[in-house]
Amino acid sequence: APDEGFWERLSAYHRNRDRTSLPDRILTAAHHYASGWEYNVIKPFNTFDEENQSIAESFTERLDGLTDLCGVNELIQGHAFFSDSPTALGRFAKLCGQLRFQIRWADTPRVPETSVLGHMFLVAGYAYFFSLSLGACPARRINNFFAGLFHDLPELLTRDIITPVKRSVNQLPSLLRAYELQELERRVFGPLSAGGHDRLVERL
């Protein structure tokens, strides 16, 4: 049966001002990491700002207070999101961040434009809500959410090749799939495995 208590739990969460629970701390860490990554992108365009360094350091200092959370320490090790040679996990996060700037259907003018990263999150959200409406168990809800969140990860490698183009040549879909798997292994799965993240690779 559909999860009848979802709305009540959602309302209770937003009414509760205590933000010290584990999920809230994970959300805080993700917020600071993403904000630091974004700031690192725009920082070179504002080199004359005297506060540049202090702003950049503020993100790392906030994350330093959350290093008891699994993965946070590795993400910021050596200021990973301000570094040209981050850890395996930091490198994967940087790769995923690139999808924020990759536009879907880039050759087809649309208003508003949508990014690949935004599309992936939207699919993940729908997958979770559809799972709720179907009465799926918690494990399936989580699996469906993350399947949606990473379903277009290969577009990091093949960029925006629209479906009509893929279908216009008989062998193109299979060739693209083979290339995607090869490059995912080389650029994503291989480095993560080498960095000790085999469990993450298995889930991806």
Residue positions per predicted region:
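Active-site-adjacent bridging/hinge elements
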Residues: 93-103
